[in-house]
Protein backbone atom coordinates (compact mmCIF):
# COMPACT_ATOMS: atom_id res chain seq x y z
CA UNK A 1 0.00 0.00 0.00
CA UNK A 2 1.25 3.48 -0.89
CA UNK A 3 0.33 6.54 1.17
CA UNK A 4 0.93 10.19 0.38
CA UNK A 5 0.60 12.38 3.46
CA UNK A 6 0.28 16.16 3.11
CA UNK A 7 2.66 16.28 0.14
CA UNK A 8 3.85 19.70 -0.97
CA UNK A 9 6.13 20.55 -3.89
CA UNK A 10 7.36 24.00 -4.94
CA UNK A 11 9.61 25.21 -7.75
CA UNK A 12 11.69 28.36 -7.91
CA UNK A 13 10.98 30.72 -10.81
CA UNK A 14 13.27 33.71 -10.53
CA UNK A 15 12.65 35.22 -7.12
CA UNK A 16 9.28 33.50 -6.73
CA UNK A 17 8.33 30.12 -5.31
CA UNK A 18 5.53 28.50 -7.30
CA UNK A 19 3.33 25.90 -5.60
CA UNK A 20 2.89 22.86 -7.85
CA UNK A 21 1.51 20.38 -5.30
CA UNK A 22 -0.47 21.68 -2.32
CA UNK A 23 -1.00 19.49 0.72
CA UNK A 24 -2.02 16.35 -1.22
CA UNK A 25 -2.95 13.18 0.65
CA UNK A 26 -4.28 9.89 -0.70
CA UNK A 27 -3.81 6.13 -0.43
CA UNK A 28 -3.33 3.53 -3.15
CA UNK A 29 -4.40 0.20 -1.62
CA UNK A 30 -3.00 -3.15 -2.72
CA UNK A 31 -4.70 -4.89 -5.64
CA UNK A 32 -6.16 -1.68 -7.06
CA UNK A 33 -6.05 -0.02 -10.48
CA UNK A 34 -6.00 3.73 -9.84
CA UNK A 35 -6.09 6.56 -12.38
CA UNK A 36 -5.13 10.17 -11.66
CA UNK A 37 -6.72 12.65 -14.05
CA UNK A 38 -7.32 16.38 -14.26
CA UNK A 39 -6.54 19.51 -16.30
CA UNK A 40 -3.18 20.00 -17.98
CA UNK A 41 -0.88 21.74 -15.52
CA UNK A 42 -2.76 20.42 -12.49
CA UNK A 43 0.20 18.51 -11.04
CA UNK A 44 -0.52 14.94 -12.16
CA UNK A 45 2.86 14.13 -13.69
CA UNK A 46 4.62 15.85 -10.80
CA UNK A 47 2.86 13.46 -8.42
CA UNK A 48 4.06 10.50 -10.52
CA UNK A 49 7.66 11.77 -10.36
CA UNK A 50 7.40 12.32 -6.61
CA UNK A 51 6.16 8.76 -6.11
CA UNK A 52 8.94 7.35 -8.30
CA UNK A 53 11.62 9.37 -6.51
CA UNK A 54 12.61 11.53 -9.48
CA UNK A 55 11.58 14.59 -7.48
CA UNK A 56 11.65 15.09 -3.71
CA UNK A 57 8.71 16.75 -1.92
CA UNK A 58 9.20 20.01 -0.04
CA UNK A 59 6.94 18.75 2.72
CA UNK A 60 4.92 15.73 3.80
CA UNK A 61 5.69 12.02 3.64
CA UNK A 62 5.50 9.12 1.19
CA UNK A 63 5.00 5.72 2.82
CA UNK A 64 5.22 2.29 1.17
CA UNK A 65 3.92 -0.68 3.15
CA UNK A 66 4.43 1.20 6.42
CA UNK A 67 7.97 2.41 5.62
CA UNK A 68 8.72 6.09 5.07
CA UNK A 69 10.42 6.34 1.66
CA UNK A 70 10.31 10.13 1.32
CA UNK A 71 14.11 10.44 1.24
CA UNK A 72 14.73 7.24 -0.74
CA UNK A 73 16.29 7.59 -4.20
CA UNK A 74 14.65 6.38 -7.40
CA UNK A 75 17.08 3.41 -7.34
CA UNK A 76 16.14 2.48 -3.78
CA UNK A 77 12.44 2.76 -4.60
CA UNK A 78 12.89 0.54 -7.65
CA UNK A 79 14.53 -2.08 -5.42
CA UNK A 80 11.59 -1.76 -3.02
CA UNK A 81 9.13 -2.45 -5.82
CA UNK A 82 8.12 0.84 -7.46
CA UNK A 83 8.41 0.99 -11.25
CA UNK A 84 7.94 4.12 -13.36
CA UNK A 85 7.10 4.21 -17.07
CA UNK A 86 7.74 7.57 -18.74
CA UNK A 87 5.52 9.33 -21.28
CA UNK A 88 8.19 8.79 -23.93
CA UNK A 89 10.11 5.51 -23.46
CA UNK A 90 13.87 5.65 -24.02
CA UNK A 91 15.40 3.99 -27.09
CA UNK A 92 18.57 1.96 -26.50
CA UNK A 93 20.70 1.57 -29.61
CA UNK A 94 22.67 -1.68 -29.49
CA UNK A 95 20.47 -3.30 -26.80
CA UNK A 96 18.10 -6.07 -27.81
CA UNK A 97 14.64 -6.52 -26.32
CA UNK A 98 15.74 -9.70 -24.52
CA UNK A 99 18.65 -7.82 -22.89
CA UNK A 100 16.33 -5.01 -21.81
CA UNK A 101 13.91 -7.45 -20.18
CA UNK A 102 16.80 -9.07 -18.30
CA UNK A 103 18.11 -5.69 -17.15
CA UNK A 104 14.63 -4.73 -15.95
CA UNK A 105 14.17 -7.99 -14.06
CA UNK A 106 17.57 -7.69 -12.39
CA UNK A 107 18.15 -11.38 -12.90
CA UNK A 108 18.58 -14.01 -15.56
CA UNK A 109 15.36 -14.30 -17.55
CA UNK A 110 14.95 -17.31 -19.80
CA UNK A 111 14.04 -16.81 -23.45
CA UNK A 112 10.76 -18.64 -22.75
CA UNK A 113 9.86 -16.25 -19.91
CA UNK A 114 10.85 -13.22 -22.00
CA UNK A 115 8.62 -14.43 -24.82
CA UNK A 116 5.77 -14.82 -22.35
CA UNK A 117 6.14 -11.20 -21.17
CA UNK A 118 6.07 -9.98 -24.78
CA UNK A 119 3.04 -12.12 -25.58
CA UNK A 120 1.19 -10.66 -22.59
CA UNK A 121 1.54 -7.17 -24.06
CA UNK A 122 0.35 -8.27 -27.48
CA UNK A 123 3.68 -8.58 -29.30
CA UNK A 124 4.69 -11.60 -31.37
CA UNK A 125 7.70 -12.76 -29.34
CA UNK A 126 9.67 -14.28 -32.21
CA UNK A 127 9.48 -10.98 -34.11
CA UNK A 128 10.72 -8.85 -31.21
CA UNK A 129 12.90 -10.87 -28.85
CA UNK A 130 16.12 -10.15 -30.78
CA UNK A 131 15.25 -6.70 -32.13
CA UNK A 132 17.17 -3.65 -31.03
CA UNK A 133 15.32 -1.10 -28.92
CA UNK A 134 16.02 1.66 -31.41
CA UNK A 135 14.38 4.04 -33.87
CA UNK A 136 13.00 1.17 -35.95
CA UNK A 137 10.31 0.63 -33.29
CA UNK A 138 7.11 2.67 -33.32
CA UNK A 139 5.82 4.56 -30.30
CA UNK A 140 3.19 1.89 -29.67
CA UNK A 141 5.75 -0.91 -29.86
CA UNK A 142 8.04 0.90 -27.43
CA UNK A 143 5.18 1.44 -24.98
CA UNK A 144 4.32 -2.26 -25.01
CA UNK A 145 7.96 -3.28 -24.61
CA UNK A 146 8.22 -0.89 -21.65
CA UNK A 147 5.15 -2.51 -20.08
CA UNK A 148 6.77 -5.92 -20.65
CA UNK A 149 9.78 -4.70 -18.64
CA UNK A 150 7.42 -3.74 -15.81
CA UNK A 151 5.93 -7.25 -15.89
CA UNK A 152 9.44 -8.75 -15.85
CA UNK A 153 10.31 -6.64 -12.82
CA UNK A 154 7.31 -7.89 -10.84
CA UNK A 155 6.83 -4.65 -8.90
CA UNK A 156 4.51 -3.77 -6.02
CA UNK A 157 3.45 -0.51 -7.65
CA UNK A 158 3.59 0.23 -11.37
CA UNK A 159 3.32 3.93 -12.29
CA UNK A 160 2.53 4.90 -15.90
CA UNK A 161 2.71 8.58 -16.84
CA UNK A 162 0.29 9.26 -19.73
CA UNK A 163 0.95 5.96 -21.54
CA UNK A 164 -1.24 7.08 -24.44
CA UNK A 165 1.13 9.94 -25.33
CA UNK A 166 2.64 9.77 -28.80
CA UNK A 167 0.85 6.66 -30.07
CA UNK A 168 -1.76 6.19 -32.77
CA UNK A 169 -5.36 5.06 -32.30
CA UNK A 170 -4.63 1.44 -33.24
CA UNK A 171 -1.76 1.21 -30.75
CA UNK A 172 -3.92 2.88 -28.11
CA UNK A 173 -6.64 0.22 -28.52
CA UNK A 174 -4.01 -2.49 -28.06
CA UNK A 175 -2.67 -0.66 -25.02
CA UNK A 176 -6.12 -0.63 -23.42
CA UNK A 177 -6.33 -4.41 -23.86
CA UNK A 178 -2.96 -4.79 -22.12
CA UNK A 179 -4.09 -2.66 -19.17
CA UNK A 180 -7.36 -4.60 -18.93
CA UNK A 181 -5.37 -7.83 -18.70
CA UNK A 182 -3.08 -6.31 -16.05
CA UNK A 183 -6.11 -5.14 -14.05
CA UNK A 184 -7.80 -8.54 -14.26
CA UNK A 185 -4.66 -10.39 -13.14
CA UNK A 186 -3.56 -7.91 -10.47
CA UNK A 187 -2.35 -9.64 -7.30
CA UNK A 188 -0.33 -8.31 -4.36
CA UNK A 189 0.44 -5.15 -6.34
CA UNK A 190 -1.16 -1.94 -7.59
CA UNK A 191 -1.25 0.04 -10.82
CA UNK A 192 -1.28 3.85 -10.99
CA UNK A 193 -1.87 5.58 -14.33
CA UNK A 194 -1.75 9.30 -15.10
CA UNK A 195 -4.17 9.79 -17.98
CA UNK A 196 -6.63 12.08 -19.75
CA UNK A 197 -8.28 9.28 -21.67
CA UNK A 198 -11.86 8.18 -21.07
CA UNK A 199 -11.11 4.56 -22.06
CA UNK A 200 -8.45 4.31 -19.36
CA UNK A 201 -10.72 5.92 -16.77
CA UNK A 202 -13.40 3.36 -17.63
CA UNK A 203 -11.22 0.44 -16.47
CA UNK A 204 -10.08 2.06 -13.20
CA UNK A 205 -11.10 0.87 -9.74
CA UNK A 206 -10.51 4.31 -8.24
CA UNK A 207 -10.20 7.78 -9.82
CA UNK A 208 -8.35 10.74 -8.30
CA UNK A 209 -9.01 14.16 -9.85
CA UNK A 210 -6.17 16.66 -9.41
CA UNK A 211 -6.60 20.34 -10.29
CA UNK A 212 -4.42 23.32 -9.45
CA UNK A 213 -2.08 21.13 -7.40
CA UNK A 214 -4.82 19.82 -5.10
CA UNK A 215 -7.21 16.88 -4.85
CA UNK A 216 -10.48 18.05 -6.37
CA UNK A 217 -12.29 14.76 -5.74
CA UNK A 218 -11.57 11.05 -5.50
CA UNK A 219 -13.42 7.80 -5.07
CA UNK A 220 -14.64 4.65 -6.82
CA UNK A 221 -14.92 4.87 -10.61
CA UNK A 222 -18.70 4.54 -10.59
CA UNK A 223 -18.98 7.60 -8.33
CA UNK A 224 -16.44 9.85 -10.05
CA UNK A 225 -16.60 8.96 -13.74
CA UNK A 226 -20.22 10.06 -14.42
CA UNK A 227 -19.32 13.60 -13.36
CA UNK A 228 -16.38 13.70 -15.78
CA UNK A 229 -17.73 12.27 -19.05
CA UNK A 230 -19.90 13.95 -21.64
CA UNK A 231 -20.15 17.30 -19.88
CA UNK A 232 -17.95 20.31 -19.24
CA UNK A 233 -16.86 18.59 -16.03
CA UNK A 234 -14.64 16.38 -18.14
CA UNK A 235 -11.72 17.80 -16.19
CA UNK A 236 -10.16 19.34 -19.24
CA UNK A 237 -8.84 15.89 -19.80
CA UNK A 238 -11.39 13.12 -19.93
CA UNK A 239 -11.59 12.88 -23.69
CA UNK A 240 -11.77 10.25 -26.39
CA UNK A 241 -8.53 9.42 -28.20
CA UNK A 242 -7.76 12.28 -30.58
CA UNK A 243 -10.24 14.66 -28.94
CA UNK A 244 -9.58 18.10 -27.46
CA UNK A 245 -9.53 19.04 -23.76
CA UNK A 246 -12.56 20.80 -22.34
CA UNK A 247 -12.83 23.46 -19.66
CA UNK A 248 -13.99 22.02 -16.40
CA UNK A 249 -15.92 23.09 -13.37
CA UNK A 250 -14.29 21.85 -10.17
CA UNK A 251 -16.32 19.99 -7.56
CA UNK A 252 -17.26 23.31 -5.95
CA UNK A 253 -18.68 24.58 -9.25
CA UNK A 254 -15.86 27.00 -10.06
CA UNK A 255 -14.22 26.84 -13.49
CA UNK A 256 -10.98 24.94 -13.91
CA UNK A 257 -9.30 25.77 -17.23
CA UNK A 258 -7.91 22.97 -19.36
CA UNK A 259 -4.35 24.28 -19.25
CA UNK A 260 -2.42 25.62 -16.26
CA UNK A 261 1.10 26.30 -15.02
CA UNK A 262 2.66 26.54 -18.45
CA UNK A 263 1.90 22.96 -19.47
CA UNK A 264 3.01 21.20 -16.28
CA UNK A 265 0.93 18.04 -16.07
Where would I find each of the regions flagged by the language model?
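Conserved ABC transporter NBD signature motif
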Residues: 60-67, 113
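Q-loop/switch helix immediately C-terminal to the Walker
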Residues: 88, 94-110
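Conserved beta-strand-loop-alpha-helix hinge in the C-terminal portion
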Residues: 214-239
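The feature captures the beta-strand-to-loop junction immediately N-terminal to the Walker
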Residues: 37-39
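Conserved structural motif at the start of ABC-family nucleotide-binding domains
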Residues: 2, 19-21
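Walker B catalytic motif
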Residues: 162-163, 170
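ABC ATPase NBD coupling module
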Residues: 68-83
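Helix-to-loop junction immediately C-terminal to a conserved catalytic motif
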Residues: 52
Amino acid sequence: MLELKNIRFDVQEGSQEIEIIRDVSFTIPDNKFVVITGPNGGGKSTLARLIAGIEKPCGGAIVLDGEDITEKSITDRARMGISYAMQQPVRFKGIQVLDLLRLAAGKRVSVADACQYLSKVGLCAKDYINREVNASLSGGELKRIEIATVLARGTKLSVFDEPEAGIDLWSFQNLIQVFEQMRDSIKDSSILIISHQERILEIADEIIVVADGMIDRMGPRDEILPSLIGTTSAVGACIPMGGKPLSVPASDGSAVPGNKKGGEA
